[in-house]
Amino acid sequence: MLKIAVPNKGSLSERAMEILAEAGYAGRGDSKSLNVFDEANNVEFFFLRPKDIAIYVAGGQLDLGITGRDLARDSQADVHEVLSLGFGSSTFRYAAPADEEWSIEKLDGKRIATSYPNLVRDDLAARGLSAEVLRLDGAVEVSIKLGVADAIADVVSTGRTLRQQGLAPFGEVLCTSEAVIVGRKDEKVTPEQQILLRRIQGILHAQNFLMLDYNVDRDNLDAATAVTPGLSGPTVSPLARDNWVAVRAMVPRRSANAIMDKLAGLGAEAILASEIRIARI
């Protein structure tokens, strides 16, 4: 039986549960449940604090876990990334009062508040800087106003919270983060784990592509299929209409409209784009 960790709350939890449900796994049901056994798939899901997940996986108590890259790195647990999930994107940066001039070198000898002390200490050590790192479990942005810290290091998504507190990020990004699946370091993925990973990959692939159908004159088929090569070649079927064929191919979601414009310019008709729910590619 697989034991999988999922964030117990927050934005990572919500999207992770959506993906798992789309992949055919049992939902949490009660938001206060600490674990759910999916008998049909022989998987037990444990709902844990995101910052603790990598530690449990590294210790062997759990097989895989969904967490943030920044949280996994800060935990210093012996895990590796098995799969990037493409949501929960953010950056980890230093920030200080917006009305002051700051550089990373100015952090030397200062007080830095953060919920990610190991990421900060590692970065400072790599730069040869020394500072007092204050660990806080939340509301890091207000620590400067309260006189606890001179600067902070925190996760930045939109930057709105920083601006509300009169802060601005400075220096380069310490870590670019997103939701990831982590496994124990130096341990191969098992066949049971591969089934779960393949299902999730199928959901992610489906989100990135659309299925495109259109009709085109055979005289323009080569030009049209050059625009829609698909993953391993488009499907081409004859139509009752003389010298015309129907074409079906997967296309990247981001460029679907531009592709449809090109097909229309080639004389293609009945150009339709449809969602792909699940895929195995």
UniProtKB/Swiss-Prot annotation:
Q: In which pathway does it act?
A: Amino-acid biosynthesis; L-histidine biosynthesis; L-histidine from 5-phospho-alpha-D-ribose 1-diphosphate: step 1/9
Superkingdom of source: Bacteria
| GO molecular-function term, one example from the UniProt record | ATP binding
| Location (main, coarse) | cytoplasm
Any single biological process term in GO: L-histidine biosynthetic process
The enzyme's main class, written as a single word, is transferase
Pfam families cross-referenced by the UniProt entry: HisG, HisG_C
Annotated Gene Ontology cellular components are:
cytoplasm
The activity regulation comment is: Feedback inhibited by histidine.
This protein's name: ATP phosphoribosyltransferase
Q: Which organism is it from?
A: Corynebacterium glutamicum (strain ATCC 13032 / DSM 20300 / JCM 1318 / BCRC 11384 / CCUG 27702 / LMG 3730 / NBRC 12168 / NCIMB 10025 / NRRL B-2784 / 534)
Q: Source taxonomy lineage?
A: Bacteria, Bacillati, Actinomycetota, Actinomycetes, Mycobacteriales
